[in-house]
């Protein structure tokens, strides 16, 4: 299995399985000299951890992080940083009924066909449990980006199933378990999830992520374009089936006179590009949306096959998120932060001394609509 590392200069390699003794990651390329404690990382992990409301999996994992290396006297040394998160609430017996079958919509079938062996307990390596170390690494990336460039990476849920969530204010996001930017809609979301759980079914979600303060110039054309790497990273999140940057698929119906963001001496007039042109950051907000599919582990009986190819019916009774999108916001934020820190370091390596006589215009003109 060779696809476990993300990044070029700032790299993250994850390890572990859902029901193994521990999960974690090794981060290489973190700049030295940044103050870092386990509390800095734990703050982000607590936003993602399971068991925080009745609407997510009831698996009770504290997700307590241990920093094993790369930090001395509270400061990063430039050496690899190893993060370890111990699994403490595995319940492998819940998965005995799927040891010989494949869950529809899950990686069970493809892992078996590719590797000839499969850890069926909680999905093993394919489990969303492996997003915890990604969030741990993302916490480090966020901290460095904020301290070095003033970059802020934030996200929110913009849709739960067919329910659109109008954006009201960022302050609402941290006040509810859905990461919804609209407190008034939370009771509707709760009722929706309660009904879904009673039905033994699941649903998808859309998550929006915004990075503010990114300087102009990050990105490596042609094939390591900033937006290409963002899409690559976002598709590496479990259950993500679609990525939009800026106007995304709505660009199909926009005319060039609308989609092209005009430039004025006072700044850009729009941001349909999502903060990226030609694979390089414009200095505007980088805006990303991801589509998350419904959880495949559900109680509703579904047709499948056994390992011998015989017909079977699959019902899953473990502790699962009826909507994995509810806890996906900090994961998507982390993925974006990991791409940004990697490109910040790559830009510094090649173009750190480049200067231009053209002024850097504001991300948004005062009269922009």
Curated annotation (Swiss-Prot):
CDD domains from the UniProt entry: Chorismate_synthase
Enzyme Commission code(s) on record: 4.2.3.5
GO cellular component, one term: cytosol
GO molecular function terms attached to this record: chorismate synthase activity; FMN binding
Pfam families in the record: Chorismate_synt
Positions annotated to bind FMN: 125-127, 238-239, 278, 293-297, 319
GO BP field: amino acid biosynthetic process; aromatic amino acid family biosynthetic process; chorismate biosynthetic process
Record: residues binding NADP(+): 48, 54
InterPro entries: Chorismate_synth, Chorismate_synth_AroC_sf, Chorismate_synthase_CS
Alphabetical keyword list: Amino-acid biosynthesis, Aromatic amino acid biosynthesis, FAD, Flavoprotein, FMN, Lyase, NADP
Catalytic activity line of the entry: 5-O-(1-carboxyvinyl)-3-phosphoshikimate = chorismate + phosphate
The keyword DNA repair belongs to this UniProt entry's keyword annotation: no
Lineage top rank: taxon: Bacteria
Protein family per UniProt: Belongs to the chorismate synthase family.
Role, per record: This reaction introduces a second double bond into the aromatic ring system.
Protein's UniProt name: Chorismate synthase
Organism listed in the record: Burkholderia mallei (strain NCTC 10229)
């Amino acid at each position: 299995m060779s696809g476990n590392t993300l990044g070029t200069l700032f790299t993250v390699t994850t390890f572990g399985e859902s029901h193994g003794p521990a999960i974690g990651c090794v981060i290489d390329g973190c700049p030295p000299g940044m103050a870092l404690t386990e509390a800095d990382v734990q703050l982000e992990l607590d936003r993602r951890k399971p068991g925080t409301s009745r609407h997510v999996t009831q698996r009770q994992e504290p997700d307590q992080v241990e920093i094993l290396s790369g930090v001395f006297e509270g400061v990063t040394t430039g050496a690899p940083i190893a993060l370890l998160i111990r699994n403490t609430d595995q319940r492998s017996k819940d998965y005995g009924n799927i040891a010989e079958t494949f869950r529809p919509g899950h990686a069970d079938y493809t892992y078996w066909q590719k590797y000839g062996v499969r850890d069926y307990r909680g999905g093993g390596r394919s489990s969303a449990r492996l997003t915890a170390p990604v969030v741990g690494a993302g916490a480090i990336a966020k901290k460095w980006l904020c301290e070095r460039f003033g970059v802020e990476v934030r996200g929110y849920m913009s849709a739960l199933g067919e329910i659109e969530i109008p954006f009201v204010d960022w302050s609402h996001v941290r006040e509810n378990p859905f990461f919804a930017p609209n407190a008034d809609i939370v009771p509707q979301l709760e009722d929706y999830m309660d009904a879904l759980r009673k039905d033994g079914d699941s649903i998808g979600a859309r998550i929006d992520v915004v990075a503010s303060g990114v300087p102009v110039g990050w990105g490596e054309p042609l094939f390591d374009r900033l937006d290409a790497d963002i899409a690559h990273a976002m598709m590496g999140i479990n259950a993500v089936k679609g990525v939009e940057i800026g106007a995304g698929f709505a660009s199909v119906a926009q005319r060039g006179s609308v989609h092209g963001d005009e430039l004025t001496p006072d700044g850009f007039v729009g941001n349909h590009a999502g903060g990226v042109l030609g694979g390089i950051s414009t200095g505007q907000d980088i805006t990303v949306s991801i589509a998350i599919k419904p959880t495949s582990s559900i109680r509703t009986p579904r047709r499948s096959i056994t390992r011998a190819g015989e017909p079977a019916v699959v019902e899953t009774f473990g502790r699962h998120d009826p909507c994995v999108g509810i806890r996906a916001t900090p994961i998507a934020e982390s993925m974006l932060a990991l791409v940004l820190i990697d490109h910040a370091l790559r830009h510094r390596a090649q173009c750190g001394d480049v200067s231009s006589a053209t002024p850097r215009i504001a991300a948004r003109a005062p009269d922009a609509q």
